[in-house]
Structures are given as C-alpha cells and as structure tokens.
A protein has these predicted regions:
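Conserved short alpha-helical segments that host acidic/polar catalytic motifs at enzyme active sites
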Residues: 1-72, 77-170
Length: 170
C-alpha cells in the first residue's frame, strides 16, 4: 500500500527530505538508486498497510510539517465517526495543511495543534507534552462519541534532534 522514507541533511536544511511511493519498496528502482547516497543522523522509514484512505502518495508516511516527521502504525477505532469533530479542534492553518484521508495524518494534526508553533523554542519536553495532549484529545473524542472499537497507536515523531515514540491502546 506504499512506503516512505524521511531523513535530515542538517548541513543544508533543517527541514527533512521525504520520498514517498505507492510501489512496494523492494520493487522501487528510484529507492534502489537513492538509498546508497543517503547519509543522515536521523532517518525514518515506513511501510503502509492501509486502514483508512486510499492508496496514494498523499496517504503515505512519514508525514511532514516544517521540521517534523511523523509515522504511525495501527488504527483509530471509529475514526470515520470522530473525524469531523477532530477537525473542529484544529486551527485553520493546521486544518488547511491536511492533504490526505488517514487517521494517522489527522492524529499528527492534533499533535501539531498542541505543539507551540508560534516561534518559541520547541524541546523534547514540549514535544512530549504535545503528544500527551493529542492522546488526551483523542481519548476525549472517542468517549464523547461512544466509540468502543479499539484504538492502537504506535507513533514516532521527530524534529531531527529529538525522537519520540509511544505505544497506545484503548
């Protein structure tokens, strides 16, 4: 259902480079060509098994915003039921950033909404607080809508310096 890689070349740009494809990674000639040329202190790779959204590069991970990379494995139970309410919690700028249909990208948007993107220094601690806040928002949405379908989130977020990973289940 696609794959993606994201990496940082901080000498040239603090924002990550991202390569996405709907082809299987083992069958992608472009990946075979660029992989030996990539050198990075921070590298994420994701193979997608679609649960929400069609197979497209737009729905492939890792998602990126500014200097952040995000990838997720799992699914948000009842996502279609809570999707509209989740979007109502987003500022216009974060809402407009969403390009795909996945529960993953929407959860990343909740994280970004919780993160202070107004120019203050972002630390590992503030990223962790934003992740906890996004999980709290998600739990609240699931409870408000009476969702009992299990949610499984295995999440990795990085800004190229700090890496956060969590496993969450309802």
């Amino acid at each position: 259902d696609g794959f993606g890689i994201g990496w940082y070349q901080k000498e040239t740009d603090p924002k990550p480079a991202v390569f996405l494809s709907v082809q299987p990674a083992w069958n992608n000639l472009n990946l075979r060509s660029i992989a030996p040329k990539i050198s990075s202190d921070c590298f994420l790779a994701h193979v997608r098994a679609a649960t929400h959204g069609h197979v497209s590069e737009t729905n492939s991970h890792p998602f990126h915003f500014g200097r952040f990379l995000f990838m997720h494995n799992g699914s948000i139970g009842g996502f279609r039921v809570i999707k509209r309410a989740l979007r109502m919690r987003l500022s216009d700028s974060i809402y407009d950033w969403i390009r795909g249909e996945t529960d993953s990208e929407h959860f990343f948007a909740l994280f970004l909404e919780r993160l202070n993107l107004k120019g203050e220094e972002i630390t590992c601690e503030s990223m962790a607080a934003a992740l906890r806040g996004a999980l709290s928002d998600l739990k609240e949405l699931l409870n408000e809508h009476g969702i009992t379908t299990p949610t499984f989130l295995n999440v990795v977020i990085t800004d190229g310096d700090a890496i956060l990973a969590t496993r969450y289940a309802t």
